[in-house]
Structure formats: C-alpha cells, structure tokens
Amino acid sequence: MSKKPLGKDKFGVQKVMRVKDYFGDATGQFALNAMSTLVGQLTYFYTDKVGMAAGAIATMFIVCKIIDAFTDLIMGNIIDHTKPGKEKYRPWLLKAGIPAGIVMVLMFTVPKIGDVGQIIYVTITNILLTAVLYTAMAIPYNSLMTVRTNSQEERGIMGTWRAATGYVAGMIFAICMIPITNALGGNQNAWIKFGFIMGIIVILAALICYATSRETATEAGAVVEVKEEDEEVIPFKEALGKLFHNKYWVIVLVVNLLSCIIYGLASGAGVYYCKWIFGNDNLVGVLGGIGMIPTLLGFILVGPMIKKLGVVKTLLVSFAMGAGANILLLFTKDIFFCYALFGSITTFATIPMMCLVGVMTAMSIDYNEYKYGVRMVATSNSASSFGGKVGSGLGTSIIGWFLAAVGYDATQTVAPAATKMAIYGFAIVTPLVIFVIMFILVSKFDLEKTLPAMKEEIAKRKAQNA
C-alpha cells in the first residue's frame, strides 16, 4: 500500500516528516531529559541520602555547569569543522548515548571516602555525564532539526514532539523517583538500582533515535532538496563574535538560560517543599501526577496557540500566566491545593518555550545567513545550549545556596522558619522574577515578521552568485 503524499506546507516548502519520523527523532530528547532529570534530583540525594553539605554541593554544581557550558562551545566547533562527506550529527547519538547510560549508575555510587574525597568523586562523575557525554549527544541532536527539513512548519512540529516527549520523560522519572527509591529501601543502594534502570532506558532511546534519524530530508526513499550547503569555515572566535552581534540569537541565549533556571528549580524544589512545608516528601509524586494535566494541556494547546498568535505572542501570554500564578502563590504558599493549582499553571506556562526554543534558534540561524552569509548551525546551537546548561546549573545551585545561607540541616524533624523562607525564595520568588524578565526580552524578538522577506533576499543573493 503506497503512502499518502505529504505535499507542501503553507509556505510552499516540501514536507518530509511522518509520525514515525517525529517519534524516532523525539526519543533523543527522551534520553536527554532522563539524564537532566536525574541530575536535577542529585542535590536531594547528596544532602539527604549521602549526607554531604548543601553549600559544597551547590558550588560543585555551578562549577560543573560552567565547565559543561564551555564544552558545548568546543563540541559545536568540532561538529562545524567535520570534513565534508561525513555525517556530522548522527554518529554522536551512539558515541555519547551508550557511555552516558553507564555513567548514570556511577552518579549514585558515591564511596565513603571522607568529605573531600566525596566532593572530588561527585565532581568528576558530574563533569563526565553533563559536560562530556550529555553535551556530545545534545549538540548534534539539536542541530539535526536544521538539516532534517526546510519546512518551518515541520520544524515546529518536531519541536513540539521533542518537548512533549522530553517533558513526559522528565515527569515520569520525577514522579517515580522518590516513591520507587523509598519502596526499594530509601537508602543509597535503592538510588543505585534506580540509576541502573534509567541508564538502560537512556541507551535504548539513543539507539532508536540513531536508527530513525537522517542528515538529509528524505521521504519514501527520495532525497528532497534539503541539505546543508558547503559554506566558508569561520574561525571559532570570529563565529562567536558574529553570534553576539545577532540580537535575536542573544535573546534566545538569555531566555533559554532563564527558562532553564526555572526548569532546574522545578526539578529540585518540589521534594524540599513537600518534605518541609507539607511534611511528607512522598507528596512530590502526587504533585508530579497532577502536573501531568497542565503538561498534556500545554502540548495540546501550544500548536493552536502558535497558529493563532504566532511564536512571540504565544510566549508572552505564557510568561504572563507564569508570573501571575507565582504572585498568587505568594499569598497561599502553605496550602497544598493552592501550591498544586498555581504550580500547574506555572508548569503550563513553561511548555511553549520548551517547544519553541529550537524554532527560535533556527530563526536566528537563518538571520545569520541573511546578515553574514553563513549559518554556523552547530556553533549557534552549541552556544545557545551554553545558556541552557548554565541556566539549569544555576537552577540547581540556587536551591543549595538558599539552603546553605540558612544553615540547612537535613537531620531535623521540623523545618525552622529560616528554612521555610529559603524554600519560598527558590520555589516562588525566583521563578516570578524570571518570568517578568523573560516577558520583557521576548517582546523585543521581532524576527518572526521580517524573516520571510529575509529568506527571499537570501534566495536572490544565491541566484545572483550561482
């Protein structure tokens, strides 16, 4: 039975993606989010299960993330300088994905070798997973979107599939992690077993993504006119200089950094909030289950919102919702129902940015071509990822710094007032401020309206130089 022709999108660009292609591509994000969710829970594991100092852990995380961010830039440079004729992106899904699954187990096997020895161990394992293996998989994977299809419509759908699949992965692991590890005994050995399960899942997801991905836009065995053209190789320093003079790329960089701070806070704050404000850390599983509702609604509604409002207005509406929800939560912070309700609205508010960061980055890459005559695909993605990595690291570290500032003691049975204020600070006040800043920045992103004319100009230049 022959497949139904895909046709062209509303801009007249040939479509090449079917459901199986979207699904296979999205498994890469599933693997990446499984890794990032694990890292987001490490503060709790290190402080409450291993007994390490919160301040030391917070500083360790931000040091690791800074190193991690710079390895993003290095990885982007490596990919952009891959010799012509070789695949740039797909091979890294296996080269990094399989070792990452193994290292995920080592994250929890912290030996009893003294405070300094433990800090050294967790620093090395965190750098290995996040700065080396996660980066070596994420940068090529993010770049695949640009070469897989020329259709802005399909890129948007890819972004939604990736965000939805990745978010589901994060939510599943966040919901299951505490109840399962508690059921397995609640000690370090229980977390090691859970890490082994997650590692196997990451390896399988990386294998599926590798098997289904392509570096050319193909459909039904036919190669469609979508491929990366050979372009002048620009020195790394010069490429970065050009990117920082692209205001749209800078906006994406900063907003991605800020949104990842919120993700980092959300992944780690819930367990502290449930344990010390509501008195039961198992409630984090309940919150995770409730959080699936706005997540599903977000992924269902983000497409119609983008179609109706466009990229920028969709983000502005979502950021306004997030800010409003956190303002209301300030006045109802000790009521579980309100925490769940306004937390759900905050969750909904983060979905559009998840879906659109790749689309906005691709738009800024198109602007690179318009302004400079070169796209710098991998370097653009890696430098944008730089912001995301620093953001998620800051999100995790902010929790530790707040707790360290008030002398957090995990052995107490009742939280002092200072500990509660610290939790309110990183769980409510910080996200509120970030939503306001993101609203202001995205309001300056006017590329969406002018991009079609820019693409026409690029096409004319290419025709003249042909």
Where are these regions (language model features)?
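Membrane-embedded alpha-helical bundles of multi-pass transporters/translocases
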Residues: S2-A466
